[in-house]
């Protein structure tokens, strides 16, 4: 998701 940071452990890089 673009709403999640790419380095965020709770947000996949996708």
Swiss-Prot record:
KW Signal (keyword) present: no
Sorted UniProt keywords: Acetylation, Activator, AIDS, Apoptosis, Host cytoplasm, Host nucleus, Host-virus interaction, Metal-binding, Methylation, Phosphoprotein, RNA-binding, Secreted, Transcription, Transcription regulation, Ubl conjugation, Zinc
Listed name of the protein: Protein Tat
Motif (Cell attachment site): 6-8
Subunit structure: Interacts with host CCNT1. Associates with the P-TEFb complex composed at least of Tat, P-TEFb (CDK9 and CCNT1), TAR RNA, RNA Pol II. Recruits the HATs CREBBP, TAF1/TFIID, EP300, PCAF and GCN5L2. Interacts with host KAT5/Tip60; this interaction targets the latter to degradation. Interacts with the host deacetylase SIRT1. Interacts with host capping enzyme RNGTT; this interaction stimulates RNGTT. Binds to host KDR, and to the host integrins ITGAV/ITGB3 and ITGA5/ITGB1. Interacts with host KPNB1/importin beta-1 without previous binding to KPNA1/importin alpha-1. Interacts with EIF2AK2.
UniProt subcellular location: Host nucleus, Host nucleolus; Host cytoplasm; Secreted
A Gene Ontology term for the protein's cellular component: host cell nucleolus
The protein's role, per its UniProt record: Transcriptional activator that increases RNA Pol II processivity, thereby increasing the level of full-length viral transcripts. Recognizes a hairpin structure at the 5'-LTR of the nascent viral mRNAs referred to as the transactivation responsive RNA element (TAR) and recruits the cyclin T1-CDK9 complex (P-TEFb complex) that will in turn hyperphosphorylate the RNA polymerase II to allow efficient elongation. The CDK9 component of P-TEFb and other Tat-activated kinases hyperphosphorylate the C-terminus of RNA Pol II that becomes stabilized and much more processive.
Keyword Zinc: yes
Family: Belongs to the lentiviruses Tat family.
Additional information: The Z-84 isolate was taken from a 54 year-old Zairean male. HIV-1 lineages are divided in three main groups, M (for Major), O (for Outlier), and N (for New, or Non-M, Non-O). The vast majority of strains found worldwide belong to the group M. Group O seems to be endemic to and largely confined to Cameroon and neighboring countries in West Central Africa, where these viruses represent a small minority of HIV-1 strains. The group N is represented by a limited number of isolates from Cameroonian persons. The group M is further subdivided in 9 clades or subtypes (A to D, F to H, J and K).
Gene Ontology MF term list: metal ion binding; RNA binding
Domain notes: The transactivation domain mediates the interaction with CCNT1, GCN5L2, and MDM2. The Arg-rich RNA-binding region binds the TAR RNA. This region also mediates the nuclear localization through direct binding to KPNB1 and is involved in Tat's transfer across cell membranes (protein transduction). The same region is required for the interaction with EP300, PCAF, EIF2AK2 and KDR.
PTM comment, free text: Acetylation by EP300, CREBBP, GCN5L2/GCN5 and PCAF regulates the transactivation activity of Tat. In addition, the non-acetylated Tat's N-terminus can also interact with PCAF.
Major localisation: host cell
